[in-house]
Amino acid sequence: KLPNTKGHVLVSDQSSMFLSKPCNVSDYGLIYAGVQKNVGPAGMVIVIIREDLIGEPQEKTPTMFMYKTHAESDSMYNTPPCYSIYMCKLVLEWLKNEVGGLKAMEKRNVEKAALLYDFLDRSKLFKGCAEKESRSIMNVTFVTGDKDLDAKFVQEAAAAGFVNLKGHRSVGGMRASIYNAMPAEGVEKLVEFMKQFEADNA
């Protein structure tokens, strides 16, 4: 649920959630999203900005960092990253033609996240970090409550083929990133591994 901004402009970094579910862009003054999570290869961003907010930047702002520069040149101020744009095109076609659009994508993502959260809610070893009303369907954070056991889990998970589960430095523990491209089968396999780890270490 969006906050009541009382007339103030709402700016949102949607790098982790962009295209994971429908979004009413008119609710925002500016949306910024790195494409590397759900849209394409790293090295490109998508910006959706209200025209009246483009305005005049501060004098010291480098030309390439000005939204005005890119808006006035239709994002062609310099040579665009053609390969990244092409890959994004393929992802968008997949999302539309194979998945069935953003509502269908959201359904997939909610179901995937539920597999993991349902296990965490029942687990006697693992505990989710986020409050239920604030849970992400893209990044699931969890801990065992023991830093050494967390490290053991990350190590054994990597050996079993579950990589990049080490948690963000601000939270610690573990983080399972289950972006659009992650199939439900991948989450199911992770839950199976977590169940076995709990049985071996509880």
Q: Whereabouts are the PLM-identified features?
A:
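General beta-strand structural signal in soluble alpha/beta enzymes
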Residues: 10-14, 32-34, 164-167
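Active-site C-terminal subdomain of aminotransferase-like
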Residues: 30, 35-117, 131, 200-202
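Short beta-strand-to-loop capping motifs
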Residues: 49, 142-146, 178-180
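Generic non-transmembrane alpha-helical segments
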Residues: 119-123, 152-161, 193-200
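A short linear hydrophobic-aromatic micro-motif
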Residues: 125-129, 161-167
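Conserved PLP-binding catalytic core of the aspartate aminotransferase-like
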Residues: 126-157
